[in-house]
Every structure is written in structure tokens, then in C-alpha cells.
Swiss-Prot record:
Keywords: Amino-acid biosynthesis, Aminotransferase, Branched-chain amino acid biosynthesis, Pyridoxal phosphate, Transferase. Pathway: Amino-acid biosynthesis; L-isoleucine biosynthesis; L-isoleucine from 2-oxobutanoate: step 4/4; Amino-acid biosynthesis; L-leucine biosynthesis; L-leucine from 3-methyl-2-oxobutanoate: step 4/4; Amino-acid biosynthesis; L-valine biosynthesis; L-valine from pyruvate: step 4/4. It comes from Salmonella typhimurium (strain LT2 / SGSC1412 / ATCC 700720). Homohexamer. This is Branched-chain-amino-acid aminotransferase. It catalyses: L-leucine + 2-oxoglutarate = 4-methyl-2-oxopentanoate + L-glutamate; L-isoleucine + 2-oxoglutarate = (S)-3-methyl-2-oxopentanoate + L-glutamate; L-valine + 2-oxoglutarate = 3-methyl-2-oxobutanoate + L-glutamate.
Amino acid sequence: MTTKKADYIWFNGEMVRWEDAKVHVMSHALHYGTSVFEGIRCYDSHKGPVVFRHREHMQRLRDSAKIYRFPVSQSIDELMEACRDVIRKNNLTSAYIRPLVFVGDVGMGVNPPPGYTTDVIIAAFPWGAYLGAEALDQGIDAMVSSWNRAAPNTIPTAAKAGGNYLSSLLVGSEARRHGYQEGIALDVNGYISEGAGENLFEVKDGVLFTPPFTSSALPGITRDAIIKLAKELGIEVREQVLSRESLYLADEVFMSGTAAEITPVRSVDGIQVGEGRCGPVTKRIQQAFFGLFTGETEDKWGWLDPVNS
């Protein structure tokens, strides 16, 4: 059984009804985690439905596949057009989009056989705020997990791979068991890495800080957008290693990601962050970000890809 979220899924070049998009139980990815994926949003904007940073997401999908040596036959342009097609086919104006490349039923054994191919799907469906409808305004409570992010020489953090998210499951589920909305992972050196499924930012004395990729953080596309928007707003941005206690002493903390968007963190480990609500710097960045879709913020980077172009 599956919870139907839309009518159609793009599956290896064909539009397949949601309930018919099936894979074999012996698919390699089910046994060994051999998949890479993306999370993308389509916003109902002043220009109509637009996919945010579409090309960058599809480039990262192919980059993730390249790191793991997964063959992908579709070009970036073909993947982008397939994405637009599935949004139109499902009559969506606002959606979460999930492209997925996975190794199917190619036989048992950790190493796929020579000449194997991958399967590619793109799903699009309505999905609201990842961490709750009120989280964008009121913020969430987070905890630092007992589970660390893996060292980059064990699991490549630049790849958005399915298997990597078992770590996220441990970080996030531990937090929820203890009554928090989200978990925060440290790297193997004890410095802040990222949230269970989000990048992390701190504000101190008007300066915006975020951990570097060397702290085992995913190169987030929303993270990159925030850095660019913040600089446009005249906010100083520093990428540097951050200690756990810096979260307690920050004026503001927020998480970022395609699903989480820009979600304030009002407490960490039960310690209130700043005033315990969405702070002024976070609010300015939120307004600039969401202003991209209302026209209040100029899209000078060409980040909005119209679905009906």
C-alpha cells in the first residue's frame, strides 16, 4: 500500500500512474542503499509556477551519481524538462519534487555487474512546511545528537545519497524521542556539522556564521542562496568551524534546506536561543528569500525556472 500524493510519476522516460510506479523487491538499492536523489521545490510565484534553482539541483543529482559511479543516461536539460512535464501532468502550481536515481534488479552482491544501468524517477506532489506549519514563524526546539556525522573519507558528504540518510534518521529520531522537533549532528572532531536534514546557521552580533563543508555538511543549494541573499542585504557572512556551545550563546539560530526552507531554532538542548523566537536577521533573510516568489526580491541570479516556459 502507498499513500497516493499525485496522479503520475515520471519513470524512465514514461508517465506512469502513481499506483503503478513499482520496483522489484530484489532491487539493488533496497539491499545496499545504492541511490542518489534531490529535493526541489516548485513555488506558485508572481510568474506562475517556478522551480527554484532547477539546474543546480539537477547538476547536483548528476554529481552525486558521478561520485558513486552510477550511470545516468539523461542530460541535465532532459531531467529538467521531465521535471516540468510531471508538474504539468499533475496540474500542480506548488510542489515538492523528488528526482531519484537508483540501481534496480541487477543481481545480488555489493558491486553491480559491468554495464549495468540505473532507473530514474521524478515525483512531484503537494507538501507544506517540513518542520510544521508554525515553525517558520515561531521556530523549533532542537537538540545536539549523540550520533555524529560520518567522516568525509568514509561517506562522501558532497553526494546526496540515500544511504547517507540512515545517519539522518538516527539524529532526527533521537531528537523526537526526547521531545524535540529536530536533531543537530556534530562532525567527528566535535564541531557543528548540520541538522538531520538541513544546513545550520548562527547569528552573533549581526554576523551570519555557518559550518564549512569540511565539517561533513552537505553543500546545500538553499544554503548557498541564503549566503548570496545575506550579502546582498549587507550582512557579513563567515564560513568557519563552530563549537556546540556557540549554539547556546548565539543571538539567532536557523536551519535551511529545500524542505525546511528557513526555519528558526528557538532553543537548543533546552537552552533558549536569543529571545526564543525568530530573530531580526533571520526574518530579513526569510523575507528576501520568499520575496523571490512574490517579486519583492529581484531574481538577479536567474534562480526561477518557469514550468510553463
